[in-house]
């Protein structure tokens, strides 16, 4: 059916044409070493196998397969633009509701025609930050052209303005001081498989100890928890190749560094960055996008 080598972002496979009536067998084979092993040299305990969720799902005839949310206040912080971009299979209708603090801020219906962009102006939005992680509830109710309900998509929206001013990083007009940690996804009991309860414990512990930043290509639930609890994130591409870097530093020969300037590695780099961005692009907690960690440099990065 398919093959994938990025071990930190989801791999999605279309099964429809392979299914038959009655019982079907679904098999997955995990390889310990592949070409991607050169790019996944992060410092952690190494285990083989599948350690994140595996699930089957179906989609309706009218389906939003991609959703992009931009919620950015202007410089006054008194009003913000909410932009919703949808990519849809089939034509239909969308009823959008934005609510928060028990109040409906926005409710509107729009038609869906494949690729659609909708924008609204929001007055006096409650801003998102580590100190006050205000989130709004966004709900998209998708129907076909006859009005029959197809799917409901819930999301969280955080309004925040992150920018550089005179060489200083600011959020909502105020200087940010990052107090971060290189957090690894690991359990002393279950290894690389970490339950939501353990993820929540990590986040609460970080907040209680004045840690406001972390980086890593984590499992999806951690990003939602960082949105909710107010943890700034550096979303990091699944790239670390310091093993080849160490060899080069020892020998003085940089020709074996990966990915460096090698065109044969560029496709993998772009695929990994795109997978990270597409999965996590709507999280207000993500302030910085990282091309990777400890990978020397070069044209590919």
Please place each PLM-identified region on the residue numbering:
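Secreted/periplasmic carbohydrate-active enzymes, especially glycoside hydrolases
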Residues: 1-233, 272, 287-288
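Substrate-binding/catalytic cleft of secreted carbohydrate-active enzymes
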Residues: 206, 212-301
């Amino acid at each position: 059916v398919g093959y994938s080598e990025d071990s930190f972002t989801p791999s999605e496979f279309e099964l429809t044409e392979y299914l038959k009536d009655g019982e079907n067998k679904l098999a997955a084979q995990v390889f310990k070493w592949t070409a991607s092993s050169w790019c996944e040299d992060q410092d952690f305990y190494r285990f083989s196998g599948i350690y994140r969720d595996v699930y089957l799902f179906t989609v309706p005839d009218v389906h939003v397969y991609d959703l992009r949310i931009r919620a950015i206040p202007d410089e006054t912080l008194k009003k913000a633009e909410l932009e919703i971009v949808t990519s849809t299979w089939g034509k239909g209708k969308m009823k959008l509701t934005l609510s928060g603090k028990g109040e409906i801020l926005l409710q509107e219906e729009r038609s869906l025609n494949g690729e659609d962009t909708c924008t609204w102006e929001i007055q006096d939005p409650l801003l998102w930050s580590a100190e006050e992680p205000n989130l709004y509830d966004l709900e998209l109710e998708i129907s076909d052209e006859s009005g029959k309900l197809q799917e409901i998509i819930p999301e969280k929206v955080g309004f925040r303005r992150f920018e550089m001013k005179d060489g200083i990083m600011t959020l909502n007009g105020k200087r940010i001081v990052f107090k971060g940690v290189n957090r690894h996804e690991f359990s002393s009991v279950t290894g690389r498989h970490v339950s939501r309860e353990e993820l929540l414990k990590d986040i609460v512990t970080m907040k209680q100890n004045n840690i406001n930043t972390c980086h890593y290509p984590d499992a999806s639930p951690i990003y939602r928890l960082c949105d909710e609890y107010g943890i700034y994130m550096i979303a990091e591409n699944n790239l670390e190749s310091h093993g080849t870097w160490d060899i080069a530093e020892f020998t003085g020969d940089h020709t074996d560094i990966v990915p460096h300037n090698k065109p044969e590695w560029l496709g993998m780099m772009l695929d990994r960055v795109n997978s990270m961005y597409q999965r996590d692009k709507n999280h207000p907690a993500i302030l910085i996008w990282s091309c990777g960690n400890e990978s020397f440099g070069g044209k590919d990065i």
